[in-house]
From Swiss-Prot:
This is Uncharacterized protein MG293 homolog. Residues 5-241 form the GP-PDE domain. GO terms for molecular function: phosphoric diester hydrolase activity. It comes from Mycoplasma pneumoniae (strain ATCC 29342 / M129 / Subtype 1) (Mycoplasmoides pneumoniae). Keywords: Hydrolase. PROSITE patterns: GP_PDE. GO terms for biological process: lipid metabolic process. InterPro entries: GP_PDE_dom (IPR030395), PLC-like_Pdiesterase_TIM-brl (IPR017946). Pfam families: GDPD. To glycerophosphoryl diester phosphodiesterases (EC 3.1.4.46).
């Protein structure tokens, strides 16, 4: 367990910048978040890209499916197009580009492997191959999470030294996976805050540190600050400690 609870910017500082973009990550750094949470998919040509959805429709306002497009194709689009404020154009980032710019800057980074809707065969091996380029830094500074426990198991089987968190937002999702398997593979649980509040005994039954998402209430943020089982809160906003 970390000595001090961390505050991670959800998809970067997404309250004031377009989510999962270089601008959102840069502002998270400038506003002194401890780290960021981001989402990773796999392109047609095997590149790890940072985006939440399986398509670019919502963020770039262009109808492309990540797994059917090359990186070059996806780089043509502006992922600030949807945002409430006009910003400089924000092309999609690769995970490598992010690591090159921010791995040394943040204390902790949460990379969500987005295999809950599409499996992206081989994505875990791609992540491992990229991580190896940075020595021990990824093992020390990155927590990999997913709603798809099989994806976490595959990453663990490749290298059991990765920090891994099981992500869930329903009671059914949590109970669908054997508790002993979760304990073997994961160092953390990342429950939706509402599930933790509704079923605290269930969530705490594994005695794993918690990363809570997504905090939008300052009252709840300070409430969870007092919870010794919470190692990190993931928020769209910057709350003052």
């Amino acid at each position: 367990m970390l000595k001090r609870q961390l505050l991670l910017a959800h998809r970067g500082y997404s309250d004031i910048a377009p989510e999962n973009t270089q601008l959102a990550f840069e502002l998270a750094f400038q506003y002194r978040f401890d780290g960021v949470e981001l989402d990773v998919h796999l392109t047609k040509d095997g590149e790890l890209v940072i985006i939440h959805d399986e398509t670019t429709t919502r963020t770039a306002l262009v109808d492309k499916t990540i797994e059917l497009e090359t990186l070059a194709s996806l780089k043509q689009d502006d992922h600030s197009a949807f945002f409430k404020f006009k910003t400089q154009p924000q092309p999609i980032m690769t995970l490598k580009e992010f690591f090159d710019q921010y791995l040394d800057k943040f204390q902790l980074i949460n990379v969500e492997i987005k295999t809950d809707q599409k499996e992206y065969p081989g994505i875990e091996a791609k992540i491992d191959a990229l991580a190896q380029q940075y020595g021990k830094k990824v093992i020390e500074k990155v927590v990999f999470s997913s709603f798809n426990f099989a994806s976490l198991q595959r990453l663990y089987d490749i290298n059991p030294n990765y920090q891994i968190a099981f992500l869930f937002w329903t009671k059914k999702q949590f109970q669908a996976v054997d508790a002993l398997k979760i304990k073997q593979v994961c160092q953390y649980l990342h429950p939706w805050t509402n599930i933790y509040e509704k079923f605290p005994d269930m969530v705490l039954s594994l005695q794993l540190p918690l990363g809570l998402w997504t905090l939008n209430s300052e009252v709840k943020f300070h409430q969870f600050r007092q919870d010794r089982m919470v190692y990190a809160q993931i928020a769209n906003k910057k709350f003052e400690v």
